[in-house]
């Protein structure tokens, strides 16, 4: 599977501390096996839990597109 990142996701990863970067990288690489859940009301949208963070992504044709990485409290307010 190929993984692509949005500008928002890259910005968040670059601003995160080393431990958070490592946890995000490991979780994203294991997306099919991770704690993922399909988001209701949005086609092809999923979320991955990484501690208190939520990785919002979509999957199409063996491509995983990481759309955003945000804290849990903000993740569900925006939907």
Residues covered by each model-derived region:
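Arg/Lys-rich, positively charged N-terminal/basic patches that mediate binding to nucleic acids
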Residues: 1-22
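Enriched for short, Lys/Arg-rich terminal
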Residues: 2-3, 19, 50-53, 58-79
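Residues that form or immediately flank small-molecule/cofactor binding pockets and catalytic motifs
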Residues: 8, 41-44, 71
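Short aromatic/hydrophobic contact patches that present stacked aromatics
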Residues: 12, 45-47, 54-56
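Short amphipathic alpha-helical/adjacent loop interface patches that line ligand
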Residues: 13, 17, 28, 32, ...
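A short, surface-exposed loop/turn module that caps and links secondary-structure elements
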Residues: 22-48, 76
């Amino acid at each position: 599977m190929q993984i692509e990142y949005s500008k928002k996701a890259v910005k968040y990863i670059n601003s995160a501390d080393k431990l958070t970067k490592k946890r995000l990288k490991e979780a994203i690489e294991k997306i099919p096996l991770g704690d993922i859940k399909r988001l209701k009301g949005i086609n092809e949208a999923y979320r991955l839990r990484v501690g208190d963070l939520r990785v919002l992504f979509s999957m199409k044709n063996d491509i995983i597109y990481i759309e955003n990485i945000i804290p849990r409290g903000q993740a569900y307010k925006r939907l």
